[in-house]
Curated annotation (Swiss-Prot):
<feature type="compositionally biased region" description="Gly residues">
    <location>
        <begin position="148"/>
        <end position="158"/>
    </location>
</feature>
<feature type="short sequence motif" description="Di-iron-binding motif">
    <location>
        <begin position="58"/>
        <end position="61"/>
    </location>
</feature>
<dbReference type="GO" id="GO:0140737">
    <property type="term" value="C:encapsulin nanocompartment"/>
</dbReference>
<feature type="short sequence motif" description="Di-iron-binding motif">
    <location>
        <begin position="52"/>
        <end position="55"/>
    </location>
</feature>
<comment type="similarity">
    <text>Belongs to the ferritin-like superfamily.</text>
</comment>
<dbReference type="GO" id="GO:0006879">
    <property type="term" value="P:intracellular iron ion homeostasis"/>
</dbReference>
<feature type="binding site">
    <location>
        <position position="52"/>
    </location>
    <ligand>
        <name>Fe cation 1</name>
    </ligand>
</feature>
<keyword id="KW-1284">Encapsulin nanocompartment</keyword>
<dbReference type="GO" id="GO:0046872">
    <property type="term" value="F:metal ion binding"/>
</dbReference>
<feature type="region of interest" description="Disordered">
    <location>
        <begin position="92"/>
        <end position="158"/>
    </location>
</feature>
<feature type="region of interest" description="Probable targeting peptide">
    <location>
        <begin position="142"/>
        <end position="149"/>
    </location>
</feature>
<dbReference type="InterPro" id="IPR009078">
    <property type="entry name" value="Ferritin-like_SF"/>
</dbReference>
<feature type="binding site">
    <location>
        <position position="52"/>
    </location>
    <ligand>
        <name>Fe cation 2</name>
    </ligand>
</feature>
<feature type="binding site">
    <location>
        <position position="55"/>
    </location>
    <ligand>
        <name>Fe cation 1</name>
    </ligand>
</feature>
<comment type="function">
    <text>Cargo protein of a type 1 encapsulin nanocompartment. May help nucleate Fe atoms in the interior of the encapsulin nanocompartment. Present in about 36 copies/encapsulin nanocompartment.</text>
</comment>
<feature type="binding site">
    <location>
        <position position="22"/>
    </location>
    <ligand>
        <name>Fe cation 2</name>
    </ligand>
</feature>
<protein>
    <recommendedName>
        <fullName>Encapsulin nanocompartment cargo protein EncB</fullName>
    </recommendedName>
</protein>
Amino acid sequence: MAGPPDSDLDDVARIRLVLARELETINEYEAYARASSNPEVRAFFQHLAAEEKEHVSEAVHMLRMLDSGQNDHFAKPFVPGHFQAAEAPAPATVHVPTPDGPAFSVNGRNGRLPSEPPTSLPPQRLLYGLPAPPPAVESHPLTVGSLRRGGGGSGSGR
């Protein structure tokens, strides 16, 4: 689905698009690493994924600086049970028999048992539960090509 041209977007919208692309790229690099049988190639893709994670942190930092409403959401703590309270009514239970055992009930959400939590992470560790740290002091605030301050990439390095 094509969106508006980049020239029609404001800075916050551009950063959100970059953030979405960075997150997708992390998934791709990590999948490539898992699929590789060569340890050196696997390490290469893990290295690339780690760099993308730094970009995600930087993009979130920029969003927090530019969008006070978004920043308010990052600063808001999540209490245990927050996500369970927000769930819609459970879908109809589907009974799936096991090949050589009794039937058990699955609620249809990613094949999880009804008693299984959606994540094993504590609520305060979820993406929106922790504020993103600012970029490291010794690092460039922006590290992508022409955006990099002090040179790098093919841009002017202003």
